[in-house]
């Protein structure tokens, strides 16, 4: 039941593959023969990996993606295309269950479904409930960046547990931002998604040259908002880079379509942005080093080398 990869977490691997879907699908439609063939092969590999990782949030996000595209183009879908879609879904589900049986992950998948249905006894429900208590006591300013995992034991997350597992985040980016940043960052994070959804749909309706690509982005943002609600892609820089790259495409497209006035920024503002960039780079380096030492500590723990565990944890902080 073990899966090996370079992303460090199977859910994060699936979610970053989902974020790249619009580029691959767009190339299948507009690319030349070689690029189209390569894109089809790449899409098949991506879907196969997503099936193998069994990330439920991404499964639902894929369903939302397909449903959104179907609704957006409902007037253009013909019976032949609908039949092809249904056949593809049936083939995909058949392939999925075949993979489950072949890799002996069927029982694990059924267990995950039962866990999801019995949500009140699940760890995720406890995460959300404790996070709501934390937010209710710190609604304006939050508890500060990186402090969710420090403050959350106070709100009953580990009551009745044996201390063998410790959560680093609430498995919900929206709750995470609210809990650590407070009201303004929490609302701002929600507004980012709402604005991107509004503008991507606007560009789909009004930009005839790239209407298909913007519809893909619209469906991607809907799916990714669901993933962010049940997972933690905000934790990884790789996800943030791709997400804000997609956001930049939407912002640039909206500015080109509606028009804008060029203005020179004051020098002090330019230097302020430069300072923020250097600070972000510094934080990224610190976090990267922390991840390296944390990984070393986990490996040392597996080898029961407790001296190295303490040393690596000290270096991680």
What are these model-derived regions, one by one?
Residues 51, 97-104, 141-143, 150-161, ...:
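Membrane-interface helix-loop junctions at the exits of transmembrane helices
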């Amino acid at each position: 039941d073990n899966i090996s990869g370079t992303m460090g977490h199977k859910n994060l691997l699936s979610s970053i593959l989902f974020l790249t879907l619009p580029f691959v699908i767009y190339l299948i439609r507009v690319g030349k023969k070689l690029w189209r063939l390569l894109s089809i092969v790449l899409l098949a590999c991506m879907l196969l990996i997503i099936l193998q990782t069994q990330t439920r949030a991404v499964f639902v996000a894929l369903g939302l993606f397909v449903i959104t595209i179907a609704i957006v183009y409902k007037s253009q879908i013909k019976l032949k295309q609908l039949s092809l879609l249904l056949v593809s879904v049936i083939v995909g589900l058949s392939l999925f269950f075949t993979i489950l049986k072949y890799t002996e992950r069927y029982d694990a998948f059924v267990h995950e479904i039962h866990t999801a249905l019995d949500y009140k006894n699940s760890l995720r429900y406890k995460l959300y409930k404790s996070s709501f208590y934390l937010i209710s006591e710190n609604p304006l300013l939050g508890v500060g960046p990186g402090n969710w995992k420090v403050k959350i034991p106070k709100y009953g997350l580990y009551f009745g547990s044996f201390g063998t597992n410790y959560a680093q985040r609430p498995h919900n980016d929206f709750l995470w931002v609210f809990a650590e940043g407070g009201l303004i960052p929490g609302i701002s994070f929600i507004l980012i998604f709402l604005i991107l959804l509004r503008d991507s749909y606007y560009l789909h309706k009004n930009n005839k040259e790239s209407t298909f690509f913007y519809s893909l982005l619209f469906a991607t943002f809907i799916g990714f908002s669901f993933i962010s609600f049940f997972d933690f892609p905000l934790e990884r820089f790789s996800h943030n880079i791709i997400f804000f790259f997609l956001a930049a495409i939407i912002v640039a497209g909206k500015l080109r379509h509606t028009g804008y006035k060029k203005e020179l920024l004051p020098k002090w503002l330019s230097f302020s942005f430069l300072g923020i960039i250097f600070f972000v780079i510094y934080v990224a380096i610190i976090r990267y080093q922390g991840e390296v030492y944390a990984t070393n500590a986990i490996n040392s723990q597996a080898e029961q080398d407790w001296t190295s565990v303490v040393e690596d944890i000290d270096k991680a902080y």
